[in-house]
Amino acid sequence: MRRSGGAGIAVLMAGAVLLAYSPVTGAAEHKFVGTAKCAMCHKTAAQGEQFPKWQASKHSKAFEALASPKALEIAKAKGIADPQKAPECIKCHVTAAGADTSMVGAKYSVKDGVGCESCHGAGADYSKKSTMEGITGGTIPAASVGLTLPDKTTCEKCHNKESPTFAGFDFEKAKATIAHEMPAERKAKYKTGG
């Protein structure tokens, strides 16, 4: 009896689509280190104080927001007992949601909400100072170590119609509210390497 490969191909394609649209960036190749690791370097004025800017943002409070009265009301209406434990909620409120525990480092915490690695990729392979210097100097391609520069598509993995509170998404406006740029003199040296 001869089998058709159509069913197998369909399963593979479905898996590829799910991975492509997963909010977990870089989970298959790189480990997550957590925002505390990022903060070690990205809190200084010389670096642009990215960490304090993130701490003041809604992203840093995304997990916490799932315990708010509004979130609990929405969850109840959808038959969800605890939004802080529901995969359909945490997938966009927690960095590395759904990632295997072997893919997260000791400093990782779900309480960090939508942390650095949700947008910039899992950081274990680019979090060392020497690696970052290689990236900024152009000798290490950022993508080769998991560092990504987020774009509209990155944001729309969560800011979309699947969210029960979605009211449209203006990428440029949203980008301005979370801007955490490097100082111009450092940015001039920065090369993504592809």
What are these model-predicted stretches?
Residues 10-20:
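Bacterial N-terminal signal peptides
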Residues 148-167:
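A contiguous, mid-protein "functional segment" used to position or interact
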Residues 1-6:
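N-terminal secretory signal peptides that target proteins for export/translocation
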Residues 19-112, 117, 123-149, 169-194:
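Sequence context of c-type cytochrome heme-c attachment sites
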